[in-house]
Amino acid sequence: DEFYKVRFADVKRRILISQERGGSDNSKHLLTKMQTKALKLNEQFDELYSELIREMARRRIFLVNEHQLDDTQKRWVTKYFRKEVMPHITPLLIKEDIDVLQFLKDEYAYITVDLQKGDQSQYALIEIPTDHLPRFVMLPEKKGKRRKTIILLDNIIRYCLDELFKGFFEYDALNGYAMKMTRDAEYDLRYEVEFSLLEQMSEGVNQRL
């Protein structure tokens, strides 16, 4: 996250400044290399995540999503949502006259909701209330089975989207997608020739204190 907040954001700013001034810049090439590296890191993360899930399963710990719940778990999740989750969430309807960025908090996770009616879509934003609730929720154990089942709070909300929107909006289908907000650190570092690297770093650190 720190990399995207500072270095990645800085390179993108350089590109925008270069475009405004009509000059050439190596930043586009650098950005491409950074994106390629980020994709490789994501692939490594996916591999490690898959291995972690397999190791958890060997220890009889299972991470499930909303599509893997049985009927008993569905009923429990719905009750948990109504009692514990719903009081802490307020969907934000996304409209053209609303500056969504002013509502997004840095380092917070959200679910974007697509409410579809015919060929039209309306969008809403839900902050995942991790300030009030655990991100990982343990489902009740089944009698006679020595296994632990865990579900993400995100998936509980996705499963219960109808609980939030039914009766307030007309829709044929709705889908939720997880996202996380990582803001540009906006260090305002100056890159004049006379500034040494040490001076630039010192200025950046001072802005963070």
Model-identified regions with their sequence ranges:
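N-terminal non-catalytic structural scaffold regions of very large proteins
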Residues: 1-209
